[in-house]
């Protein structure tokens, strides 16, 4: 597969890319083939990627095992259904968190769910345990595997965080998601990845979580039921198709996920919808952030945090964005994570070399 990072292209090469990318009204383009479903709802197509998110111990890997077992067997597992074409039946499973022993347990679980023998390696499933490697080497290994495995249709990456040195790095996150978009388009595969949620809220962790939310075809949440801790609930958080009915599973005595047939989805709250949490990345354009910072730092660097927050309020107010204290704190955190503002010693200052 072609790697285009940090290389300088000639005008002729750029012209070729432009020609390749031009959309014609007279051409015929195929709709992305559907390959993964929950009941009758589409959650995955070739040429796209999706994700499962959840807090620690929510059984995310058990849920992913069911997805893989469905793709491997072509049958329904839990509520997952798969329809991969014959030339897209190979599955690549990447585990970045567990050692070889626990990866083998996951592999055996998948085979049992798919009703396949555990005493021999499956023809259409390759599992790689990449825990011991650096993020850069993990990425290179995965790129090589995706580029060379024939008849590849599904790639599982558990988890995406381990491809980054800094989970809040905007440039690293953009690079990884760009790789996902390149791989899925070039090879016409579907990638499903796994990411932890923040401990204190429902958001996927770090800037990589924000990028996933913006670009993924489907985001599913796996959450421990608040009333029965033995049950995990799967529901759609972001989805391009219609939402599927949330479903639940538990781990049985044989350490296998099984559906909870008696589970009833929680009713949606009646009345005014709950307001979405304030997110500076989504709600305020980059040019507004820039103009607000120019105004906030018009008199130079700022020497303490409280003054910094007050100057932010003034700077954003000049751009018609009103910030109370809590929103100003969120904006300050966002600017720090984006490295638009950095702290040098005791002073806050604009970073001209930030990457949005």
Predicted regions and their residues:
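C-terminal regions of RecA-like/P-loop NTPase motor modules
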Residues: 4-10, 148-149, 226-356
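The Walker A/P-loop phosphate-binding site
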Residues: 5-110, 352-354
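Conserved catalytic network of the ASCE P-loop NTPase/AAA+ motor domain
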Residues: 44, 83-86, 118-120, 147-149, ...
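Phosphate-binding/switch region of NTP-binding enzymes
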Residues: 51-53, 57, 62, 171-259
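Conserved inter-motif catalytic segment of the P-loop NTP-binding fold
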Residues: 85-168
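Short beta-strand segments at enzyme active-site cores
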Residues: 155-158, 190-195, 341
């Amino acid at each position: 597969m072609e790697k285009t990072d940090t290389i300088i292209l000639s005008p002729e090469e750029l012209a070729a890319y432009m020609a390749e990318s031009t959309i014609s009204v007279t051409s015929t383009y195929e709709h992305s083939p559907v390959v993964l479903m929950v009941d009758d709802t589409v959650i995955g197509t070739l040429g796209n990627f999706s994700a499962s998110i959840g807090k620690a111990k929510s059984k995310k890997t058990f849920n992913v095992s069911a997805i893989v077992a469905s793709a491997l067997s072509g049958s329904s597992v839990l509520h997952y259904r798969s329809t991969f074409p014959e030339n897209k039946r190979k599955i690549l499973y990447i585990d970045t968190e567990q050692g070889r022993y626990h990866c083998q347990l996951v592999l055996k679980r998948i085979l049992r769910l798919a009703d396949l023998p555990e005493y021999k390696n499956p023809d259409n499933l390759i599992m790689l345990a990449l825990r011991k490697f650096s993020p850069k080497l993990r990425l290179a290994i995965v790129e090589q595997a995706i580029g060379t495995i024939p008849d590849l249709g599904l790639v599982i990456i558990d988890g995406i965080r381990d491809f980054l040195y800094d989970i809040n790095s905007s440039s690293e996150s953009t690079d990884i998601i760009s790789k996902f978009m390149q791989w899925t388009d070039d090879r016409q595969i579907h990638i499903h990845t796994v990411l932890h949620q923040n401990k204190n809220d429902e958001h996927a962790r770090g800037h990589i979580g924000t990028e996933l939310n913006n670009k993924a075809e489907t985001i599913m949440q796996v959450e421990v039921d608040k009333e029965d801790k033995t049950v995990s609930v799967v529901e759609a958080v972001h989805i391009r198709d219609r939402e599927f009915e949330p479903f639940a599973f538990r781990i049985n005595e044989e350490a296998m996920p099984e559906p909870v047939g008696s589970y009833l989805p929680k009713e949606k709250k009646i009345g005014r919808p709950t307001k979405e949490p304030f997110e500076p990345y989504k709600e305020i354009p980059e040019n507004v952030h820039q103009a607000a910072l120019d105004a906030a730092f018009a008199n130079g660097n700022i020497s303490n945090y409280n003054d910094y927050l007050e100057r932010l309020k003034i700077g954003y107010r000049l751009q018609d964005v009103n910030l109370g204290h809590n929103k100003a704190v969120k904006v300050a955190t966002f600017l720090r994570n984006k490295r638009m503002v950095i702290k040098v010693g005791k002073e806050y200052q604009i970073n001209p070399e930030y990457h949005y």
